[in-house]
């Protein structure tokens, strides 16, 4: 469900901000990186403790283009642990290049509290045929001013992040857990248009993400029981920058 905002532009139709997911506005989000873990065991655990959510496919394929400035300040802020901080991305699902439905997202973090503005876009023409300059100009034309300003500060496409994701939720829907694996990163720096050539794959990388209200930590532990993960920093965008050599090597996990 989205707001009834109706704005049209050449390449995109802005449907509006997703208001069906109130949990996106403010929530506590934690991540755990588990190299070479058995995805099947975690899937079985969550199928017993939670309910599976299916969005189009039982296993979603998520692809996001992250935008940053020329100095990669958003990436550096994450590496340095600076808070609050933001990330800007264009996301789509279940196709190698963008299809008819995309989401422009501004994600913010203040310590462990996070939130996300998620705007649904409908493509009026093939997005993969646009140059990045055209893509950014088209987004600027249709985005609300406060979101447009976030993109203007980050005018460079940096990394396309790709992974497979499985979704689970508590019985009441307040808590969510995702299993992310089969990660791949595509360097977008200096590219004229969206590039899916020469992926840098990390098949051993497995990420468990938990998301829910700040006051539901006990319930979250019950959802993951008997697994008691040690949560830590794990930005897929930052991992992509590190793996592609866009930032100096650093022990980031």
Tell me the role of every PLM-derived stretch:
Residues 1-253:
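Phosphate-end processing signature that detects enzymes handling 5′-triphosphorylated RNA
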